[in-house]
């Protein structure tokens, strides 16, 4: 067959919006030819009713055309005798192979999980060490105008009740430093900034 000789086994879907094929489709089912995917000049040859192949313009067109013609002639002269034959014990071998393959994949999955757990533990210890050093650097790089206490002014009747305090808590200060959007809290901060500018 052509597939075993010229094509990769896996089918790939390819978006082809500017195709020059007579029956233009957005998705074309393609089989890429091994060793011929890097050629510049390519031609799209119909393989089946819904499948097309790209091949080099000069090579393989005669081979592909001959193989397609042979395939069509074989399909015409095939009889139903092959379909009528009964195959015994064919499923049992397949089931044994499948169980064996499943056992192998489960074993490899378990070993991969164990390796991943060990890697995560090592990464966590490395991250803790890195975080400690980063915190020391951040404390050293703190600007002279940065403060942990924000002075509140009077007349905050527009603010929610839970924000009314003389000093901000540590959580509120961390929230301000992260810069995450929160409309109520942003109004609160804007009022403080506007009061300081006056």
Curated annotation (Swiss-Prot):
Residues 106-136 form a coiled coil. Keywords: Coiled coil, Merozoite. The keyword Coiled coil applies. Residues 75-94 have a biased composition (Acidic residues). Residues 72-95 are annotated as: Disordered. Possible candidate for an effective malaria vaccine as determined by epitope response in sera. It comes from the Eukaryota. This is Uncharacterized protein PF3D7_1409200. It comes from Plasmodium falciparum (isolate 3D7).
């Amino acid at each position: 067959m052509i597939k075993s000789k010229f094509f990769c086994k896996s089918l790939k879907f390819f978006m082809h919006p500017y195709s020059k094929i007579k029956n233009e489709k957005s998705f074309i089912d393609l089989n890429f030819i091994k060793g011929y995917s890097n050629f510049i000049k390519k031609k799209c040859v119909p393989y089946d009713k819904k499948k097309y192949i790209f091949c080099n313009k000069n090579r393989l067109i005669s081979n592909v055309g001959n193989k397609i013609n042979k395939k069509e002639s074989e399909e015409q002269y095939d009889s139903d005798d092959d379909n009528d034959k009964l195959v015994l014990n064919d499923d049992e071998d397949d089931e044994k192979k499948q169980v064996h393959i499943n056992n192998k994949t489960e074993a490899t999955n378990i070993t991969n999980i164990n390796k991943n757990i060990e890697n995560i533990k090592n990464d966590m210890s490395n991250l803790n060490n890195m975080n400690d050093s980063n915190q020391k650097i951040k404390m050293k790089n703190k600007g002279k105008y940065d403060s942990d206490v924000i002075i509140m002014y009077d007349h905050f009747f527009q603010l929610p009740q839970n924000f009314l305090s003389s000093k901000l808590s540590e959580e509120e200060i961390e929230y301000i430093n992260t810069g995450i959007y929160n409309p109520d809290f942003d109004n609160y901060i804007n009022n403080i900034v506007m009061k300081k500018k006056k």
